[in-house]
Amino acid sequence: MRRLWVATSWEDVKDKFATYGEYDFKEMGNCGAVTYPKIEKKASGMRGVLIVFNMNSNMGGSEIVRTVAHESVHVANAIFDELDIAYDLVNDEHAAYLVGWVAKCCWKMLQKDIYKD
């Protein structure tokens, strides 16, 4: 089983996760969002993928939609890669469903931050 975590702040995740991949788990600077594959939550040992959105990047409207779509594809590819699940340009229905589910999860989390005032 793999989990998806979505955060809107590096501060919320920096001490709670570690990578079991071949990269350093660190803040990625000036970008709208970053997907961290092969991530493990320290407290539970659960493994999955983490997306961290940078809500200080002044993203709005269509830029949020673009970023969610972009990161959703990264998440789907990371999960399929780790679980050795293949898809191609003709046999991609399962990938489309996973990308849609990831996008919905992102939007649920982002709404809390966008409409908090």
Language-model features, listed with the residues they occupy:
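Acidic, glycine-rich loop-and-strand cores that form catalytic or ligand-binding grooves
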Residues: 1-21
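Active-site scaffold of zinc-dependent metalloenzymes
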Residues: 19-62, 75-78
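Post-HExxH zinc-binding segment in Zn-dependent metallohydrolases
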Residues: 86-117
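Residue-level detector of short, conserved catalytic/binding motifs and their immediate flanks
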Residues: 49, 65, 94
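Short, flexible coil/linker elements and helix-boundary hinge sites characteristic
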Residues: 18, 22, 82-84, 113-116
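Short alpha-helical catalytic segment bearing the HExxH-like zincin motif
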Residues: 63-71
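Short, solvent-exposed segments of well-ordered alpha helices
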Residues: 59, 63, 87-90
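Catalytic Zn2+-binding segment of zinc metalloproteases
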Residues: 72-88
